[in-house]
Design a protein with these regions (language model features):
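Conserved C-terminal structural/oligomerization subdomain of aldehyde/semialdehyde dehydrogenase
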Residues: 8-9, 24-28, 69-204
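Terminal amphipathic helices with adjacent charged low-complexity linkers/tails
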Residues: 12-18, 22
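Short beta-strand to alpha-helix junction loop
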Residues: 35-45
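Short beta-strand segments
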Residues: 36, 59-62, 127
Length: 204
């Protein structure tokens, strides 16, 4: 599952450097397709422009990319990484649905969890750490329906539940796994009692 936002705790510049290296391997028209429509393109670039004007730093700009390969028609955006995003920016509060990742910086783990929980959406969250205690805190406190530890949240296969919390919730059940079977199951409750008195009571 793609992540829309990274909340970095402490010194994360070395992680961002690696992200830039990997993101540049995504080539529009070669191994990165276009967004679905002109409206989507304008919406996504609008998020980027607003964040830039509000003081965020564009580390990798995917606007107006050079498109390689034969499939050049389409609304292409290259991978985009935006640092120093703040919670008052629209890009931090809404779903982008594009090749864009926003980086929000937090002073410590408590602040990072507060940032995650302040978001109205709660589909999934992931934590990357070598501390079992920190991982446990995120698993227990993050307001999300799916949690990944040292792995980007995998979209589960049918036997596992898939669903979020808050504004990402589908309803009373997840769309896969046991609860999806329960959703489509029509329950019937039957209560029985058998004893010798049944032969002589007033309803026999």
């Amino acid at each position: 599952m793609a992540a829309a936002q990274m909340v970095g705790v402490g010194g994360i510049d070395h992680i961002i450097d690696r992200m830039l290296v990997e993101a540049k391997k995504l080539i529009p028209g070669k191994n990165l397709g276009p967004v679905i429509s002109k409206a989507a393109y304008e919406r996504i670039t609008g998020y980027i422009e607003e964040a830039e004007k509000a003081g965020a730093k564009i580390l990798l700009d995917g606007r107006n990319p050079k498109v390689e390969g034969g499939a050049k028609d389409g609304y292409y955006l290259g991978p985009t990484i935006i640092d120093h995003v703040t919670l008052d920016m629209r890009i931090a509060k809404e779903e982008v649905f594009g090749p864009v990742i926003s980086i929000v910086r937090a002073k410590d783990l408590d602040a990072a969890i507060d940032i995650e929980n302040a978001n109205p959406y709660g589909n999934a969250a992931a934590v990357f750490t070598q501390s079992g205690g920190q991982a446990r805190q995120v698993m227990e406190r993050a307001s999300a329906g799916m949690i990944g530890v040292n792995i980007g949240v995998p979209v589960p296969r049918e036997p596992f539940s898939f669903g979020g919390w808050n504004d990402s919730k589908f309803g009373t059940c997840d769309i896969t796994g046991k609860s999806s079977v329960e959703f489509w199951t029509q329950l019937k409750k039957t209560t029985t009692k058998w004893n010798p008195e049944g032969k002589v009571n007033w309803m026999s």
